[in-house]
Swiss-Prot record:
The active site is at residue 68. It comes from Clostridioides difficile (strain 630). The record marks 11, 69, 153 as: Important for substrate specificity. It catalyses: dTTP + H2O = dTMP + diphosphate + H(+); UTP + H2O = UMP + diphosphate + H(+). It is found in: Cytoplasm. It comes from the Bacteria. This is dTTP/UTP pyrophosphatase. The keyword NAD does not apply. GO terms for cellular component: cytoplasm. Nucleoside triphosphate pyrophosphatase that hydrolyzes dTTP and UTP. May have a dual role in cell division arrest and in preventing the incorporation of modified nucleotides into cellular nucleic acids. One of its GO terms (biological process) is nucleotide metabolic process.
């Protein structure tokens, strides 16, 4: 049984590489749309499941991991900004405020008929940002492929006042919860590998 990460995210790859488990990466191909009335928790769990299922259908003997992360402020989902103006607006909205980062994770092994879906929530409080802080951060080009227009593992850490919860969840893969689920449902220990 192999592990496959159904993600093109370099951050998720790096987090999983810090364990002793061997894995392959296969990029998933799904449309990340929000369904009408869908809550952020349901959205990330559904998208994580769709990502893992899109790969598991052709790799049914493997454990396929899917993940999806969103930033939530005032019950509004902040996805990846489409352009610099959108990123600027997101950072202004986040300035001085606390928001949630929610990551859905899905583990599927079709051969054993196992499907596990979960989510993790972390809270992040931003410093009060000046216009110059926002412009300086935008110049780093970190905003454009990240939910909420920032990456805490890079220069985005300079925007953050406080976090509560799993740091790796904020980066995009809650490795502690993932390790618990792999051990409980698939007898895979991230300390030792498969």
């Amino acid at each position: 049984m192999n592990i496959i990460l159904a993600s093109a995210s370099p951050r998720r790859k790096e987090i999983l590489e810090n364990t002793n488990v061997r894995f392959d990466i296969i990029k998933n191909e799904i449309d990340e749309i929000i369904l009408e009335g869908e809550t952020p928790k349901h959205l990330v769990m559904r998208l994580a499941f769709e990502k893992s299922m899109s790969v598991a259908s052709e790799h049914n003997e493997d454990v396929v991991i899917g993940a999806d992360t969103v930033v939530v402020l005032d019950n509004a989902i902040l996805g990846k900004p489409k352009d610099e103006s959108c990123a600027r607006d997101m950072l202004k909205r986040l300035s001085g405020r606390e928001h949630q980062v929610i990551t859905g994770i899905s583990l599927i092994n079709l051969c054993e008929d196992k499907k596990v879906i979960d989510y993790v929530i972390s809270n992040v409080k931003f410093k009060t940002l000046s216009e110059q802080d926002i412009e300086d951060y935008l110049k780093t080009n970190e905003s454009f492929d990240k939910a909420g227009a920032y990456g805490i593992q890079g220069y985005g850490a300079l925007l953050v006042e406080e976090i509560r919860g799993d740091y790796f969840n904020i980066v995009g893969l809650p490795i502690s919860r993932l390790g618990d689920l792999l051990k409980k449902y698939f007898s895979i220990n991230l300390f030792y590998g498969v």
